[in-house]
């Protein structure tokens, strides 16, 4: 059994680049529309909640509410971009377009393909998160140096959510099933991770639950950087995101092996 599983793992450290490049070549034809689409929801939330609700809320943790919200929207934009790329575009390449089927006829293994797809989703998340942060910095809700410090965190956040979404992609019979992942996992996590309001406002049980959510760890790294504040538990948050990035990858490869190669 181990030999069968090992045979579908990445063949070498660079094969995935071919998959990434193929996706990039297809994406760049509609790059502007893709970027605007990924920015629409977080930017709308930033302006709608930040200025509308912010006028009533005032300050949160000593800062204007819109500045507090901006960091949450940066992490959220990375989450949304990586997730939707994986559960929709990747699923289409695997199921409807049969792009994976063609790729498996080459020297690429299933692991190479999955790793390339995750790297591409993380790249789109990095682009979306960076664009959102530039909007926040332009409006004065983030320091410009923080953009550079937050880039690795945004990329890692994208990879982590892409890995989690790949499990859903491996299990879902069709597109209709993705709505369960969005409504039962992503939406509750948005409100439990400190993106919209401080986690300290939640009941104790939900505060403890937030420590298990990848979005919470991402926000705990991005918000202090954007606000030029010292952050605590940096190693813990990075380690948690790495676990969410790596473990689901291996699990999804095993699930996809059963689905495609059995």
UniProtKB/Swiss-Prot annotation:
Against Pfam families, the record matches this protein to: ABC2_membrane
Instruction: Give the transmembrane ranges.
Output: 35-55, 62-82, 125-145, 147-167, 177-197, 236-256
The residues covered by the ABC transmembrane type-2 domain are: 33-259
CC annotations in GO: ATP-binding cassette (ABC) transporter complex
- GO MF entry, a single one: ABC-type transporter activity
Q: What is its main location?
A: membrane
> For this chain's UniProt record, which GO biological process terms are given?
oligosaccharide transport
* Family named by the database record: Belongs to the ABC-2 integral membrane protein family. Lipooligosaccharide exporter (TC 3.A.1.102) subfamily.
Subunit architecture: The complex is composed of two ATP-binding proteins (NodI) and two transmembrane proteins (NodJ).
Query: Which NCBIfam families does the annotation name?
Result: nodJ
Q: What does the UniProt function comment say about this protein?
A: Part of the ABC transporter complex NodIJ involved in the export of the nodulation factors (Nod factors), the bacterial signal molecules that induce symbiosis and subsequent nodulation induction. Nod factors are LCO (lipo-chitin oligosaccharide), a modified beta-1,4-linked N-acetylglucosamine oligosaccharide. This subunit encodes the transporter.
Write the protein's name: Nodulation protein J
